[in-house]
Structures are given as structure tokens and as C-alpha cells.
Regions:
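Short hydrophobic beta-strand element within catalytic cores of glycosyltransferases
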Residues: 269-272
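Nucleotide-activated donor-binding/catalytic signature segment of Leloir-type glycosyltransferases, i.e.
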Residues: 213-234
Length: 347
């Protein structure tokens, strides 16, 4: 029997959160390469149930996506079953949990118990190694890729009938504080007098009640902006195709945002916050545009709204970047090589 892999994730499809999208893409790619695996979604099953099912599955390796949310159970299972543990370190892990007084001890125990630790970008690995230098030899960089494989059409007009000729700014993100969803509204409101064709689209679940309610209250008075709800990932390519500028306003990212990668792959112009995770993908003025604050957002948004040629040039450069540097095959090869160093896997 081929060596099996048990994947533990804080979220999995049909969730459209970044972790779920990443896990689904990697699991699909590894399965296509002949790696037997099963994914457990910790958001829908009790830990005791997951533990019993994983033990019955008899895996040769446990792979946890998210050190804090999935790593603790994965570490306990790896020790109980005497098998290696692989941990994929996420944005929340790197930017918050590793330094949080309450969560850091548990996160560090998980990292120290892992046979391999994967990160999406070298900068995240450097951050981990600065805190836990003994882990550097176990760190492996596996860059993310794009998995827009299902192209179901999205009837945007059914959610928000838009006139022709609009310039659609899209924020595809779960509504929570780290995504800073309120940031675009004031600058775009000021620009809407110069560019009445501007429309602002929010697409994603309302995960934080406080932020979600504040956003909906604000949108109620803005006829040019709307939250269209959660869009299934299978329809994301269609939504991107109906947008002109894709926003990422995050305060932090775990190396590479799925939303930015997908926007680049779709040939959309990207306007993103100037943070480490976004800089790993967006070369300012080449593959997208970066902003440092609300004032700079307004300047860059005006440039993009008024210059379709600029949007086209940025989109084409982004599409070429993803095709050249972030193919799906490299991501899947990376995880397969990590596994191969620990257990027998198909060539």
C-alpha cells in the first residue's frame, strides 16, 4: 500500500477563505501525481472525531496547514502514530500567532515538533528563523501557485445590475480587520466626482461581525459600492474577468495572497498595500501598483481609473509573471519533494 498523507486544515472547500483555496489546490495536484491523501476540515468536525478518523486512516505523514489552528492536533497525532509532521506556516501564524503572548508557546511547540516546515516566501522563513534559529535547517520555501481550474460563469448582474462603461474595483476577501476593507471607501468617494464610472465591489464572507456591520452600514449610503456576498471559488475567474482593478488592502499577508496571484493570472490590474507579502508578487509600476496609505491609494486609484492602457499593461505583465514564475507544477513538485524526504511517494 502506498504511503498515505493526512492533511489537517482550519478550513477546506466549500469555504472560500485563502487557506481553503490553497489546501484544495495542493491536494488536487498531489492526488493527480498519485499521492494518496485525505483532507480533514477542522472547522466542521470535532477534534476527537478527526483524531479517530486519522488514526483509522493509518497515514505515513501528517501535514498541517496553519501551525496554531491545525498544528496542535496534528502534532499530537504525529507523536501518537510515530510518524513525521509537516507544517505549512501561514500568514496569521507568521504575523500574529508566533508573537502573541497566549498563542506563541503552542505555536513554537508545533514548529519544534515538525520534521519539515514549509513557507510561501523566504521572508517568512527568515522571520521564523529569527525567533527559532534551530529550525532553519528544516525550513523549505514552496511558492504558491494559482488554481482557477473551474470556470463557472457568475451572473454579476443578478447580484448588482451595472451599466456599461463602469470601472469596477474589486476587493475579493473575507471581511475581517486584517483585510482593512473600509480603506478604499473614503478615497474612492472623493474620486467618484471626477470618475462617476467608478464602482466598488466587495466579494467575500462577513467573518468579523463588527467589521461586517460597519461596512454594510457605510455601503448603505454609497450607491457606487456594494457587497455582493460570497462568491464560490469556481466562479472567481468569471468575477475577475468582469472587474478592472483588483484590490488587496491587507495589513499583513503570509507571503503570497491567493487573491493577488489569481488577479495577476487573470490579467487584471492590481492595486495592493505596500506590505511584505504583496511586494513578493507586485513590482510597483510593473506587475501592479502598491500604496502605503490612503492618500497614495487615492492617487494610484485615479491613475488606474483614468488610464485603460495602464490597466492593460499591468495586467499583461502580471499574467506573464505568474505563467513564468508560479506554475502549478512547481508548487506540487515542492510539496512532493518535501514528502519524499520523509516517506516513500510516487515519482
Amino acid at each position: 500500500m502506498a504511503a498515505r498523507v493526512a492533511m489537517l486544515a482550519p478550513f477546506a472547500p466549500p469555504s472560500v477563505r485563502g487557506n481553503a483555496v490553497t489546501v484544495a489546490r495542493i491536494a488536487r495536484g498531489l492526488t493527480e501525481r498519485g499521492v494518496p491523501l485525505r483532507v480533514w476540515d477542522l472547522s466542521v468536525r470535532p477534534e476527537a472525531t478527526v483524531a479517530a478518523e486519522v488514526e483509522a486512516y493509518r497515514p505515513a505523514l501528517v501535514h498541517a496547514f496553519h501551525a496554531h489552528r491545525a498544528g496542535r492536533l496534528a502534532l499530537a497525532l504525529a507523536r501518537r502514530l510515530e510518524i513525521p509532521l509537516v507544517v505549512t506556516f501561514t500568514g496569521t501564524d507568521a504575523n500574529h500567532d508566533l508573537f502573541d503572548a497566549e498563542r506563541a508557546p503552542a505555536v513554537r511547540r508545533v514548529l519544534e515538533g515538525a520534521a519539515r516546515l514549509t513557507v510561501f516566501h523566504a521572508s517568512i522563513g527568515d522571520r521564523v528563523a529569527a525567533v527559532l534559529p534551530d529550525l532553519r535547517a528544516r525550513l523549505v520555501v514552496v511558492p504558491q501557485s494559482v488554481g482557477l481550474v473551474a470556470h463557472e460563469p457568475l451572473d454579476l448582474r443578478a447580484r448588482w445590475p451595472l451599466p456599461s462603461g463602469v470601472v469596477a474595483f474589486l476587493l475579493p476577501a473575507a471581511i475581517r480587520p486584517v483585510k482593512d476593507p473600509m480603506l478604499p471607501l473614503a478615497p474612492l468617494e472623493r474620486l467618484s466626482t471626477r470618475f462617476p464610472e467608478i464602482r466598488m465591489i466587495y466579494a467575500g464572507p462577513l467573518l468579523d461581525p463588527g467589521v461586517g456591520e460597519a461596512l454594510l452600514r457605510r455601503l448603505a449610503s454609497l450607491p457606487w459600492a456594494r457587497h455582493i456576498g460570497t462568491v464560490p471559488h469556481a466562479q472567481m475567474a468569471s468575477l475577475l474577468a468582469q472587474s478592472d482593478v483588483v484590490l488587496n488592502c491587507s495589513l499583513s499577508e503570509g507571503g503570497m495572497a491567493n487573491s493577488v496571484l489569481e488577479a495577476l493570472a487573470a490579467g487584471r490590474a492590481v492595486l495592493a498595500s505596500d506590505i511584505e507579502g504583496n511586494r513578493s508578487l507586485v513590482e510597483n509600476g510593473v506587475t501592479g501598483v502598491l500604496f502605503r496609505d490612503e492618500a497614495e491609494f487615492e492617487v494610484r486609484a485615479a491613475e488606474l481609473a483614468g488610464d485603460p492602457g495602464l490597466r492593460e499593461r499591468l495586467g499583461q505583465a502580471g499574467r506573464e509573471l505568474v505563467a513564468r514564475d508560479y506554475p502549478l507544477s512547481r508548487e506540487i513538485d515542492g510539496y512532493r519533494d518535501v514528502y519524499r524526504a520523509l516517506i516513500p511517494v510516487p515519482a
